[in-house]
């Protein structure tokens, strides 16, 4: 005769994400601009030993061609100088910080098996970036030239590492490196 295996499954998933963002741009006579901003993130994906992350940013833009005493520099009819510094983050997956198990059903009975080995110290990957550049309008603004130099440094990079399968955990563990 034919036999059928019945499988029942129920799952309840809850994640909590809290963030706050503020930004202000201050201008002076339409040729000097300063932008200040900040973001704070807290997420249930962060490990239990980590509370939240603060990401500041600042940028300055100076437009000498709009300052009132600009007569041009040869073929350069307009010029904007700019610089910025900021931080940004990449959060881990919702359950990467937690150790989890799988429910198993077999002909021999029910059981559990290791699934994910969590990391209570897990936190977001953070990138710090600095940039400097300019925009120039050439030949009565018929041509535009833009240049940007930037440098990014990433710390606490999220890295998936595999443990020996003999330990029972089949999934890779996400951890911070660097």
Give the location of each predicted region.
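Extracellular/periplasmic, surface-exposed regions of secreted and cell-surface proteins
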Residues: 1-178
């Amino acid at each position: 005769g034919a036999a059928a295996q019945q499988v029942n499954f129920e799952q309840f998933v809850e994640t909590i994400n809290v963030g706050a963002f503020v930004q202000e741009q201050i201008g002076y006579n339409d040729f000097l601009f300063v932008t200040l901003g900040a973001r704070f993130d807290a997420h249930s994906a962060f490990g239990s030993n980590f509370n939240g992350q603060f990401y500041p940013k600042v940028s300055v833009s100076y437009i000498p061609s709009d300052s009132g005493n600009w007569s041009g520099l040869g073929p350069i009819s307009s010029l904007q100088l700019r610089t910025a510094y900021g931080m940004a983050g990449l959060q881990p997956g919702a359950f990467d910080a937690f150790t989890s198990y799988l429910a198993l059903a077999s002909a021999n009975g029910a059981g559990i098996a290791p699934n994910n080995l969590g990391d209570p110290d897990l936190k977001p990957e953070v990138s710090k970036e600095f940039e400097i550049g300019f925009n120039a309008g050439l030949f009565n603004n018929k041509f535009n030239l833009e240049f940007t130099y930037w440098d990014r440094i990433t710390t606490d990079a999220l890295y998936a590492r595999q443990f020996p399968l003999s330990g029972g955990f089949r999934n890779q563990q996400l951890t911070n490196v660097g």
